[in-house]
C-alpha cells in the first residue's frame, strides 16, 4: 500500500522555519500545515510571531486562525485537523509540509499516536485541577517528577494541562504516559515522510530570540494582550498560558514591571528552545540542518530538495 507523502520542517523557535517553508513549498508544490499550538488562535498574532498574509506569497496555510482564544486546543484535536488538512492538500494535488516547533505535536502526526482518550476520568481530572490550583505549579511538577521523570523532563513546570494529563494517566492506568508514548513512536509511520530540523548554533539562536521578543514589543504585544484581557480572557484560558501572553498579563495585573515581563519572555523562550532542541535530538530519521552554513535560503532549499530526491531513488513511493 502506497503511503501518503509528508514533509516535516521543524526546529526551535526563531530558527527561521517560516521563510524556509515558503521557499520549499514554492519549489516542490507544497501547502503548509502549522504545527504550532498557539497560531491556531485568532487575534493572537504578535505574540505568536504569526505569518502575515503577504509573507505567505500565495502558499496556502492550514491550522492558522481557526479557533477563538476562548476555545481549548489539545493534541487530539490537532491530530484530527492535520489529517483533514492532509487529505485536502492531496485533493489539491500538492504535497503537505508540516511546519512548527512543537515536537510532541509533530510526533503525534508522524506516528499517528493513540492517546487513549477513552480513559479520561472527569472526577480524577477535576481533583487534580483543584490540587494544582491549591498547591501550585511547583508542587504538582515535583509530584510528576516522582511519578514519571521522563515526562517531567519534557514538560514545562507551568504547563498545567500536560502535567495533569500525565498524572491522570498514571492514576487511571497504573502505567507511565511516557512509556505509552514511546511505544507509539515505535510504530511504523502511516506516511512516507522526510523530517528536516533547522538547528542553528545556540548563541545565534538565543540572539535571534531576544531580537524577536524586542520586535514583538515594538509591534504591539502589550496592546494585543490588553485587548484580549478586555475581551474577558485571563490566565485561566489555555490560549493565555502561552509564552509572551502570561508574562504580559502579569505586567497588566501589576505583579511585575514591563521590563521584568520582557526579560521573563526572553528567558522562558530560550528555555523553551532548549527543550525543543532536546526533543528533536531524540527523534529518529531526522535530517539536521544548520541554516547558517548556507549562503541563503535558496541554497538551503536546494540541499533539502536534493535530500528528498536522494530518498526518492531508494523509495519509489515518493514520486
Segments and roles (model prediction):
Residues 1-319:
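Phosphate/pyrophosphate-binding catalytic cores of soluble transferases and nucleic-acid-acting enzymes
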Amino acid at each position: 500500500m502506497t503511503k501518503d507523502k509528508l514533509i516535516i520542517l521543524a526546529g526551535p523557535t526563531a530558527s527561521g522555519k517560516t521563510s524556509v517553508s515558503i521557499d520549499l513549498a514554492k519549489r516542490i508544490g507544497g501547502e503548509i500545515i502549522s504545527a504550532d499550538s498557539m497560531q491556531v488562535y485568532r487575534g493572537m498574532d504578535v505574540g505568536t510571531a504569526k505569518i502575515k498574509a503577504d509573507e505567505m506569497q500565495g502558499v496556502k496555510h492550514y491550522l492558522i486562525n481557526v479557533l477563538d482564544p476562548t476555545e481549548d486546543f489539545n493534541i487530539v484535536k490537532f491530530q484530527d485537523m492535520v489529517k483533514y488538512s492532509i487529505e485536502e492538500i492531496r485533493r489539491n494535488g500538492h504535497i503537505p509540509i508540516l511546519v512548527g516547533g512543537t515536537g510532541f505535536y509533530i510526533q503525534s502526526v508522524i506516528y499517528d499516536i493513540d492517546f487513549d482518550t477513552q480513559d479520561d476520568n472527569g472526577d480524577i481530572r477535576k481533583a487534580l485541577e483543584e490540587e494544582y490550583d491549591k498547591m501550585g505549579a511547583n508542587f504538582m511538577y515535583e509530584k510528576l517528577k516522582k511519578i514519571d521523570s521522563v515526562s517531567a523532563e519534557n514538560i514545562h513546570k507551568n504547563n498545567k494541562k500536560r502535567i495533569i494529563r500525565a498524572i491522570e494517566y498514571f492514576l487511571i492506568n497504573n502505567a507511565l504516559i511516557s512509556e505509552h508514548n514511546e511505544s507509539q513512536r515505535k510504530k511504523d509511520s502511516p506516511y512516507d515522510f522526510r523530517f528536516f530540523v533547522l538547528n542553528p548554533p545556540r548563541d545565534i539562536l538565543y540572539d535571534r530570540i531576544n531580537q524577536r521578543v524586542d520586535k514583538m514589543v515594538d509591534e504591539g504585544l502589550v496592546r494585543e494582550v490588553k485587548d484580549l484581557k478586555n475581551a474577558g480572557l485571563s490566565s485561566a484560558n489555555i490560549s493565555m498560558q502561552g509564552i509572551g501572553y502570561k508574562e504580559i498579563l502579569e505586567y497588566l495585573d501589576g505583579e511585575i514591571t514591563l521590563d521584568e515581563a520582557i526579560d521573563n519572555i526572553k528567558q522562558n523562550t530560550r528555555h523553551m528552545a532548549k527543550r525543543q532542541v532536546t526533543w528533536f535530538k531524540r527523534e529518529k530519521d531526522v535530517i539536521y540542518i544548520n541554516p547558517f552554513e548556507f549562503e541563503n535560503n535558496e541554497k538551503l532549499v536546494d540541499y533539502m530538495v536534493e535530500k528528498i530526491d536522494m530518498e526518492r531513488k531508494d523509495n519509489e513511493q515518493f514520486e
